Amino acid sequence: MPKTQKPFRIGFFIDGFTLHKVNHYYKYYHKFHSHISFSGLRNFVMKQVKPYCPKNKSLILEGHYYHSRKNPAYDNECPFNTSLERFEEKLLDQGIQMHYPNAPLDWKTSGNSDLINDIKMYAMFQEIDIVVLLSTQGFYAETAKMLREQKIPLILLGWNFAYPKNQKLILWKTDIDLKNYAFQYIAMEKIMDNKNMTSLFEKKPKLLIKPTHKMSYRFQRA
């Protein structure tokens, strides 16, 4: 009787701070005016990983979303709301688990330690064959370096974009060190601008009317 092949395991880790900023951009400032679809994102990740999967193995994705704020269910200052509940349901529908930090995060000085520690744990116990990380932040560059040293491929989903806000031009860029340590970098802003990739949006994209007047900008990092 032939030996059953172990599945090819994908660890999909989502930096909630990055996704929050990216979602805000696509909903309110991008021409398509829509949030990102988690089902579309999951399918996209599976397609990107498939070429690396041996033909005799099946693909299994384990998804983790790391929220940038404490769980409001245990925080009297920030009561749980229905929009967050719906957000969690969207994640769970795609097999993605929500993680909240135990303490408030300062995104200007550090990344999400739970995200970092979980990737290290999965890598240490060899529970994943490939990592897909959605993030633009340099706080995770050392984690990407660690994966390279352990010969675990990292596919990085990142964004570079700019948009006007309050007479300023907001810039959002993927950290260069994080990008360089990745086995493969995918410029998601280019993917999502492709008219054939509308499945990555919750709603059918509709174009926003662009302002006809000229504006002067001051530059500000997002």
PLM feature segments, named:
Residues 1-109, 160:
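Domain-level signal for Mg2+-assisted phosphodiester chemistry and nucleotide/NA-binding surfaces
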Residues 82-221:
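Nuclease catalytic cores that cleave nucleic-acid phosphodiester bonds
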